[in-house]
Amino acid sequence: MAHKKAGGSSRNGRDSESKRLGVKRFGDQQVLAGNILVRQRGTPFLAGINVGTGRDHTLYAKAAGKVQFVRRGPKSRTYVDVVTN
């Protein structure tokens, strides 16, 4: 005979792996060309001066310099710039 009553089987207990999104290099930080600045879904941040956009909307530095976050344009969107030295 069983020593314990049978435990129920739950159908929960799964979760997706975190995608490590977010800002990777903050304002006034020095970066090299190719450094990832922001990983994002969609475009909360837009590519500014010396910044490129990847297929998955990742922003990366096209030149070495200092990172700047600037709000501009008619909708006051946030742009990420890399200001060269």
From Swiss-Prot:
Alphabetical keyword list: Ribonucleoprotein, Ribosomal protein
Top-level taxon of origin: Bacteria
Positions of region (Disordered): 1-23
InterPro entries named among the record's database cross-references: Ribosomal_bL27 (IPR001684), Ribosomal_bL27_CS (IPR018261)
SUPFAM superfamilies from the UniProt entry: Ribosomal L27 protein-like
One MF annotation (Gene Ontology) recorded for this entry: structural constituent of ribosome
GO cellular component: cytosolic large ribosomal subunit
GO biological process terms, semicolon-separated: translation
HAMAP family, sorted: Ribosomal_bL27
Family in the record: Belongs to the bacterial ribosomal protein bL27 family.
Name of the molecule in the record: Large ribosomal subunit protein bL27
Gene source species: Nitrosococcus oceani (strain ATCC 19707 / BCRC 17464 / JCM 30415 / NCIMB 11848 / C-107)
Source species taxonomy: Bacteria, Pseudomonadati, Pseudomonadota, Gammaproteobacteria, Chromatiales
